[in-house]
Structure formats: C-alpha cells, structure tokens
Amino acid sequence: MNKAILAVAMVLLLAGCATKPEEIGRAPDLSPVAAHLGMQNNPQFNGYPARPGKASYSLWDQRSTNFFKDPRAATPGDVLTVIISINDRANLDNKTDRERVSKGIYGGGGSFATSSITGAAAGGDMDASVNTHSDSKSKGKGTIERSEDIRLQIAAIVTDTLPNGNLIIRGSQEVRVNNELRVLNVAGVVRPRDISGNNTISYDKIAEARISYGGRGRLSEIQQPPYGQQILDQFSPF
C-alpha cells in the first residue's frame, strides 16, 4: 500500500516538473560564436560538377560573372544582410453538403392448381415482396484564417560556394532580455546577382530558405506543458 502511494506521489511530482533543476534561477546561456562557419564543408552538395579552374594569364575568371572586383559577398567567410519582411494573409472557407437517398421495392407472386397426376390439391398462393431504403448524408465545413507580419534584418555568413557560383548562407542572432532568449536563424542558397549593391538580399530570393524565429527561457517554459504531462499525453490512450 505504501509503495502504491509513493508511486502515485512520484508521478504527481513528475507532472509538475517544468524546469530542469540546473536551470532554476538562471538565465539561458548564449550559444558560442561559430567563427568556423566560413570554412564549413557541405557534403550534401558534393554531387555537383567541379568548378572550372582559373586560367593562367587571363583577366577573365570563368568561376565568376563579374569582370571587376565586387565588394558584395561572394566567397566563404563574407557577410551579407538578409532582409525579412513577411506580410502574409490567408483566408480559406470550405463547405460541403452531400445527400443521397435510394429506395427500392421488389415483389413477386404465384398460384398453384390441383395436380393432374395425383389429383391432390397441390395449389396455393404465394406473394413475396422486399422493400429497401437507404439514406446517406454528410456535411462538412472548414475555415482557416491566418495572418503573419514579420519585419527584421539579420546578418548571415557565406559558408560555401556551389559549382555554379551560388552561395550557401547561414546566419544566427540571439538577444537575451532578462531571462528570455530570442533566437533567429536563417539559412539557404542565394545567387550573387540577387545581392544588391549595399550587400543586402531579400528573403524571397533565398532558395531552400529556412527561417526560424523563437526563443527559450522562462516565458517559453511557461507556455510548454510540464515534462510529466507530456509523457502522460504520449502514453495515455484517452
């Protein structure tokens, strides 16, 4: 009996745990600055053909479309600014109404006379009928309304160059206010020609863009259910 009470008490205590013990009373730590980003190797892009080599005694470099030196980001380690200005609105309203009714009546009858062979009465009347009725109805309605407005800028670093000259960029920004850490990450592939003269590029010109904006800290922990409740939600069949 005592073991059962102890087990229930431990489950209740686990359900109330929302913060790691080592993080109680501490602000979230900032991530270390990744100075090695400019020399990252991206094996997922190794399937591209090799870049042409630079010819000796040539003023034109086949690896670049620019004849003169361009101060914009072009090689691993260079920095450019990504401008994120998202103002999306979506409003979808779907409604379906389906009804199907089917009815059927099937009947049959017959009569029998006196048998001419035995002379016995072998006659009779038979009447059989079958009625069928089917009714099916379905209705559905769905409404989606979404509005997003994000406006910010973040500096990203060129981590690699593809054989065709496109640049792989990655950027991260962390701002800690009191005990809440706001984290912004951006990554993707850009064309050098899309980078403006002031070394900026819009988010909608980034291919394979991965943009995340979130945080961690006390406010984020309050918004999340405790660990015990998450475990119970995963294994509870109800």
UniProtKB/Swiss-Prot annotation:
The keyword DNA repair does not apply. A lipid is attached at residue 17 (S-diacylglycerol cysteine). It is found in: Cell outer membrane; Bacterial flagellum basal body. Transmembrane segments: none annotated. GO terms for molecular function: cytoskeletal motor activity. A lipid is attached at residue 17 (N-palmitoyl cysteine). GO terms for biological process: bacterial-type flagellum-dependent cell motility. It is a lipid-anchor. Keywords: Bacterial flagellum, Cell outer membrane, Lipoprotein, Membrane, Palmitate, Signal. One of its GO terms (cellular component) is cell outer membrane. Pfam families: FlgH. Residues 1-16 form the signal peptide. Belongs to the FlgH family. NCBIfam families: PRK00249.1-5. Assembles around the rod to form the L-ring and probably protects the motor/basal body from shearing forces during rotation. The basal body constitutes a major portion of the flagellar organelle and consists of four rings (L,P,S, and M) mounted on a central rod. PANTHER family: FLAGELLAR L-RING PROTEIN (PTHR34933:SF1). This is Flagellar L-ring protein. The lineage of its organism: Bacteria, Pseudomonadati, Pseudomonadota, Alphaproteobacteria, Hyphomicrobiales.
